[in-house]
UniProtKB/Swiss-Prot annotation:
<feature type="binding site">
    <location>
        <begin position="349"/>
        <end position="351"/>
    </location>
    <ligand>
        <name>(6S)-5,6,7,8-tetrahydrofolate</name>
    </ligand>
</feature>
<comment type="pathway">
    <text>One-carbon metabolism; tetrahydrofolate interconversion.</text>
</comment>
<comment type="function">
    <text>Catalyzes the reversible interconversion of serine and glycine with tetrahydrofolate (THF) serving as the one-carbon carrier. This reaction serves as the major source of one-carbon groups required for the biosynthesis of purines, thymidylate, methionine, and other important biomolecules. Also exhibits THF-independent aldolase activity toward beta-hydroxyamino acids, producing glycine and aldehydes, via a retro-aldol mechanism.</text>
</comment>
<feature type="binding site">
    <location>
        <begin position="121"/>
        <end position="123"/>
    </location>
    <ligand>
        <name>(6S)-5,6,7,8-tetrahydrofolate</name>
    </ligand>
</feature>
<dbReference type="Pfam" id="PF00464">
    <property type="entry name" value="SHMT"/>
</dbReference>
<dbReference type="InterPro" id="IPR015422">
    <property type="entry name" value="PyrdxlP-dep_Trfase_small"/>
</dbReference>
<dbReference type="InterPro" id="IPR015421">
    <property type="entry name" value="PyrdxlP-dep_Trfase_major"/>
</dbReference>
<dbReference type="InterPro" id="IPR049943">
    <property type="entry name" value="Ser_HO-MeTrfase-like"/>
</dbReference>
<keyword id="KW-0663">Pyridoxal phosphate</keyword>
<feature type="site" description="Plays an important role in substrate specificity">
    <location>
        <position position="225"/>
    </location>
</feature>
<dbReference type="InterPro" id="IPR015424">
    <property type="entry name" value="PyrdxlP-dep_Trfase"/>
</dbReference>
<dbReference type="GO" id="GO:0019264">
    <property type="term" value="P:glycine biosynthetic process from serine"/>
</dbReference>
<dbReference type="InterPro" id="IPR019798">
    <property type="entry name" value="Ser_HO-MeTrfase_PLP_BS"/>
</dbReference>
<comment type="subunit">
    <text>Homodimer.</text>
</comment>
<feature type="binding site">
    <location>
        <position position="117"/>
    </location>
    <ligand>
        <name>(6S)-5,6,7,8-tetrahydrofolate</name>
    </ligand>
</feature>
<dbReference type="GO" id="GO:0004372">
    <property type="term" value="F:glycine hydroxymethyltransferase activity"/>
</dbReference>
<keyword id="KW-0808">Transferase</keyword>
């Protein structure tokens, strides 16, 4: 980054500081990951200069012959990975991918069935502070009070009662496998469309380690980062019958020119996903999550639903007599990055919360294995149990430093 250093020392310094943070801390935010150098090179390429409104072969600008190739590569690879009939790789985010699906099939005020945010859903699945909850009549379903797993009988009952035009499955904080086949059966029974937001589990689906929603859903949306380990962005997969409508909803519906440098990075990431090594990586994500969950439970911590089937773990910190906000802060102090998170049947404010969400995608990318999961579990428990003990926190910080120093990353930067 010599050019940047000469041109803008302040921005360069901030980026260098962030690189230092990523190297020195244990990254456990479930929605974050570390992309390859190849993905970063594509995203930082000359494609950032090119406007390309429209789609390959039908652009509103000249000079698009090379970016057309890139977008076709991204679309074709995504189709191959997930077995989709049609793919749109232009959404700038998962939220915009969801918006495009809603705009394709819904009218303002239509009824939609979506997962309660505090039970693990997402803002764009009907939260009243989000456009989805403002534009549409979302009815919430959630998890069972005892098992903390989706109550499919409740989903069916609410679908029969409210007759939604669309049912949305998928979550941002649900650590268990979702039965997409059951959801589609419910949707068919009430004559609803079925959409899956697989943003968190897309990489696991790609590796064949989580049921694929594509054969069951009319529409599937995802981000391209998280477990998929690509650049920050979105994508829509759908049946061919909806292809033209979806494409029109993205452009000119809610977006203008696509970010061709990001689409190039998506293409590179999808190419990585198609390699055998990616399946091994995804299996390590799950193995690490299970080991970490077991370690946390051995330390006496309470996990929502009692464990995990994917990359994600949700810790209920109430028995430690602290809040999610305090837990996030004290863990960050010792070098462990997490996020506070609501838990099912939450009573605290979203700014305070009773839980902490963690995930293993980023640490697995860094090379952490089962032994490191044991140490991380011990560190999390030790830190939270001693959150007011400065001596203990200093010891935890040194243990984090000792652990991260064994795993180099981005050595060429």
């Amino acid at each position: 980054m010599n050019h940047l250093k000469r041109q803008d020392e302040k921005v360069f310094a901030a980026i260098e500081a962030e690189l230092g943070r990523q190297r020195s801390k244990i990254e456990l935010i479930a929605s974050e990951n570390f992309v390859s150098e190849a993905v970063m090179e594509a995203q930082g390429s000359v494609l950032t200069n090119k406007y390309a409104e429209g789609y390959p072969g039908k652009r509103y600008y000249g000079g698009c012959e090379h970016v057309d190739v890139v977008e076709d590569i991204a679309r074709d690879r995504a189709k191959e990975i997930f077995g989709a009939e049609h793919v749109n790789v232009q959404p700038h985010s998962g939220a915009q991918a969801n918006m495009a699906v809603y705009f394709t099939i819904l009218e303002q005020g239509d009824t939609v069935l979506g997962m309660n945010l505090s039970h693990g859903g997402h803002l764009t699945h009907g939260s009243p502070v989000n456009f989805s909850g403002v534009q549409y009549n979302f009815v919430e379903y959630g998890v069972d009070a005892e098992s903390h797993r989706i109550n499919y009988d409740d989903v069916l009952a609410k679908a029969k009662e409210h007759k939604p035009k669309l049912i949305v499955a998928g979550a941002s904080a649900y650590p268990r496998v979702i039965d997409f086949k059951r959801f589609r059966e419910i949707a068919d029974e009430v004559g609803a469309y079925f959409m899956v937001d697989m943003a968190h589990i897309a990489g696991l689906v790609a590796a064949g380690l989580h049921p694929n929603p594509v054969p069951h859903a009319h529409f599937v949306t995802t981000t391209t980062h998280k477990t998929l380990r690509g650049p920050r962005g979105g994508m829509i997969l759908c049946e061919e019958q909806f292809a033209k409508q979806i494409d029109k909803s993205i452009f000119p519906g809610i977006q203008g020119g696509p970010l061709m440098h990001v689409i190039a990075a998506k293409a590179v990431a999808f190419g990585e996903t198609l390699q055998d090594e990616f399946k091994t990586y995804a299996q390590h994500i799950i193995n690490n999550a299970n080991r970490l969950a077991e370690g946390l439970q051995k330390e006496g911590l309470t996990l929502v639903s009692g464990g995990t089937d994917n990359h994600l773990i949700l810790i209920d910190v109430r028995n430690l007599e602290i809040t999610g906000k305090v837990a996030e802060h004290v863990l960050d102090e010792v070098g462990i990055t997490v996020n506070k998170n609501t838990i099912p049947f939450e009573t605290a404010s979203p700014f305070v919360t009773s839980g902490v969400r963690i995930g293993t995608a980023a640490v697995t990318s860094r090379g952490f294995g089962l032994e490191e999961m044991d140490e991380i579990a011990a560190l999390i428990a030790y830190t939270l149990k001693n959150h007011e003990n400065e001596v203990a926190l200093e010891e935890a910080s040194k243990r984090v430093e000792a652990l991260t120093s064994k795993f180099s990353m981005y050595t060429d930067l």
